[in-house]
Amino acid sequence: MAEASERLYRVEYAKSGRASCKKCSESIPKDSLRMAIMVQSPMFDGKVPHWYHFSCFWKVGHSIRQPDVEVDGFSELRWDDQQKVKKTAEAGGVAGKGQDGSGGKSEKTLGDFAAEYAKSNRSTCKGCMEKIEKGQVRLSKKMLDPEKPQLGMIDRWYHPTCFVKNREELGFRPEYSASQLKGFSLLSAEDKEVLKKQLPGVKSEGKRKGDEVDGADEVAKKKSKKGKDKDSKLEKALKAQNDLIWNIKDELKKACSTSDLKELLIFNQQQVPSGESAILDRVADGMAFGALLPCKECSGQLVFKSDAYYCTGDVTAWTKCMVKTQTPSRKEWVTPKEFREISYLKKLKVKKQDRIFPPETSAPAPPHLPPSVTSAPTAVNSSCPADKPLSNMKILTLGKLSQSKDEAKATIEKLGGKLTGSANNASLCISTKKEVEKMGKKMEEVQAANVRVVCEDFLQDVAASTKSLQELLSAHSLSSWGAEVKVEPVEVAAPKGKSAAPSKKSKGLYKEEGVNKSEKRMKLTLKGGAAVDPDSGLEHSAHVLEKGGKVFSATLGLVDIVKGTNSYYKLQLLEDDKESRYWIFRSWGRVGTVIGSNKLEQMPSKEDAVEHFMKLYEEKTGNAWHSKNFTKYPKKFYPLEIDYGQDEEAVKKLTVKPGTKSKLPKAVQELVGMIFDVESMKKALVEYEIDLQKMPLGKLSKRQIQAAYSILSEVQQAVSQGSSDSQILDLSNRFYTLIPHDFGMKKPPLLNNADSVQAKVEMLDNLLDIEVAYSLLRGGSDDSSKDPIDVNYEKLKTDIKVVDRDSEEAEVIRKYVKNTHATTHNAYDLEVMDIFKIEREGESQRYKPFKQLHNRRLLWHGSRTTNFAGILSQGLRIAPPEAPVTGYMFGKGIYFADMVSKSANYCHTSQGDPIGLILLGEVALGNMYELKHASHISKLPKGKHSVKGLGKTTPDPSASITLEGVEVPLGTGIPSGVNDTCLLYNEYIVYDIAQVNLKYLLKLKFNFKTSLW
């Protein structure tokens, strides 16, 4: 059963007379029965109710099949009102006579379903995503756009056959028939007959006499009678219980003030909630069933919600308690002596009893969500049908493509997308490299709108590849700019407001027209200690205040997987660049979306501004601004150590196109440019769902990344020990708060298995290397006389020389590449583009003690291009102590291979980005500890210097050559004779960084054999 907070609908008695009905706009009187649909707020990370008069709610059209399961607050209603809601839901809501003139029950017109002839060929079927041709019969279900609820209900059209397929999900009940569709009477007689056959109404009838077999019907009747008697008894008990509770509430309202009720709760050691009705509910529950004892797991307060008692406490500062029970521990409810003067309390005697619950019913499939529709857009179109990967995306085409415009349009529409002629409306641009280089007026508009440009091959690959949309976008990208691709919002079924005109104030969650600046990557204006948020409108006239060495800017995060929230809160104290004027700017919302808002307040003085800033910070975090040791409190935000340092402009200078000043060989220049390519770093982070708006590239501190590693270690331990759900939930909340992720409107996934831990470890490994690369870009010399390439080259602290293609050295390496390409790695061939001889500063000196060790081999090590700035400047490193051992088959060490393709797979190239880098290192292996299966090595056995994971295939040892005492295993792969191993190929692991001396770096081209990889 869904928790109350997750239910789409809510019912209650109006707490005041302030709310207005979304259908008729009239006020809803206090204490009258009202119903709501819960919609995502465009202003903050949470849902809000859209209230209706009870009768108006049904007029706008809803399909509630089980009110006790689907409607929050149903069980708290008076018994008669519960029956009223049930009967109205069963009858399909309020409706008039059927359009064919009959007034029978089965012929009521269904207000939220319609039939008509398509007025144009512009509509798209929401079932198959194909066009509905003009003049064809089409059926609709009214649905709400969750991002723009003020637009009310919108018809979402289907082909009749697609509607029939999705009948149950759309809430078109078995007893409904085609003749109940609005507009049915306007169809031709022929089309009416076809629809009646496609959508017949099924009447519930008993068995015919001819169906009876050997008295089976009599047995069924007896069983049915017993079941009915049992249900009748339970229903009577539930009614009596409901009457008792409401009798207590009615009498308490007459006899006691709200202050009296609070006193009763405090005396019985119950928490006092906010709101008069909640206080009354708690007192009535205690009087009827006894005072609730604290939760056994966290000592929190248990509270009745629809189907059980839920704990409202917190197991830790990060996570709420998950305890839910129908049989909570209680003690006797005690009325204080001074309250016995109240006649009702004096004579009230309730027999001790347990609360009765209706039998649990599984929630029906949400009627408002067709299979191809999600509640809100995400950064990647993961929820669309497999054959419609571009669903809800607008595509712009520019330049001369191999297909004609009509062919391209047909291809895009077949994949679920729409063609657009405006850069401002586009999700994506398809063009050519030539057009990007030419940079014509249209392409300038695309760049200004920050729309990503991809090559035409993207259309072919997106139709066939099993890779995620985001990976394919990264692989086929042609532009150095481009925000994360957003799809158009899709709708969920919900009621219609009175007016269909959009509110001028409300932007909705995702703009369809124009470009929302917060949807694209922000340009941060850096002044002094931090970046001024551009949403403040003061980025060119003010700066962030710095006082006493502290920058008055804070970025806070809060993740609650249970509630599905992924929130941020930003706070800045801004000072005018010229005058003594001060502002407090704050913004809040959901990470990875444009849900949220902001506020700019001008303050009377600097002192007032500082005081207000500190007050807000403490209110949001529970900690004083100047507190040295931060303490996390439940439901409070946590500060992210995001450094919007002063060196952003320096990075831009160093990443501009190199001039002619560099004396480095062309191949080395290209290599350095590749290693320090900021766009590649961004792409890598986008693949990991890192939010580049809340956590710009290179801004998360190393300390925070290490803290995230520690959490993953705890997750690994919790998973392996089978820890409680609460502990897993707590660790997941902590991790996602520390490392902001962009999940769009999806709930953050739990980190509850080894695979998810391994994926996040890999993400943090890359984050650390990218942090190193970005730190190198920002730091060091600011010598404007040097070419940017030379400046970056010096930061690598590595001597890089190009190896002559015709040399014997190059021939040996090319042979090593050719011979050791494994037969199972057959998706690509490797082409050696350049070979570089490398010597890292200080590495040969560090390696010197191991130079005399026997068994030294030249082995492969592959990694992402984005990691090479860190590798060359700091060497190959072992995972930090904080990192979990999961993902490292033989523990934390440096891994090598003797088969080139085994290492090449770690380069993470793709057809759209086929160039990778791979290393050859001299590795001092000495005595090897040979293993056939995973073993988390923390310390090698005595006398061993390394680990060898034995593979089933090995380079032919007879073909190995020795160069300067180092074995080069360049033979072709042959069976090793080791069969009972879990490895296909050998792995070599050393646990001391000094045992590695990097010798060569190869630039490889991965020639993929087919686009269907």
Curated annotation (Swiss-Prot):
Record CDD domains: BRCT_PARP1 (cd17747), parp_like (cd01437), WGR_PARP1_like (cd08001)
Residues covered by region (Automodification domain): 373-523
Residues bearing PTM PolyADP-ribosyl glutamic acid: E407, E413, E435, E437, E444, E445, E456, E471, E484, E488, E491, E512, E513, E519
Residue span(s) of domain WGR: 541-637
Record domain PARP alpha-helical: where: 661-778
Gene Ontology biological process terms, A to Z: apoptotic process; ATP generation from poly-ADP-D-ribose; decidualization; DNA ADP-ribosylation; DNA damage response; double-strand break repair; innate immune response; negative regulation of innate immune response
Record PTM N6-acetyllysine, positions in chain: K97, K105, K131, K599, K620
Location of the PARP catalytic domain: 787-1013
ZnF PARP-type span: 9-93, 113-203
Record entry for activity regulation: ADP-ribosyltransferase activity is regulated via an allosteric activation mechanism. In absence of activation signal, PARP1 is autoinhibited by the PARP alpha-helical domain (also named HD region), which prevents effective NAD(+)-binding. Activity is highly stimulated by signals, such as DNA strand breaks. Binding to damaged DNA unfolds the PARP alpha-helical domain, relieving autoinhibition.
Annotated positions for site Cleavage: D214, G215
PTM info: Poly-ADP-ribosylated on serine, glutamate and aspartate residues by autocatalysis. Auto-ADP-ribosylation on serine takes place following interaction with HPF1. Auto poly-ADP-ribosylation on serine residues promotes its dissociation from chromatin. Poly-ADP-ribosylated by PARP2; poly-ADP-ribosylation mediates the recruitment of CHD1L to DNA damage sites. Mono-ADP-ribosylated at Lys-520 by SIRT6 in response to oxidative stress, promoting recruitment to double-strand breaks (DSBs) sites. S-nitrosylated, leading to inhibit transcription regulation activity.
Motif Nuclear localization signal in this chain: 207-209, 221-226
Protein name, per record: Poly [ADP-ribose] polymerase 1
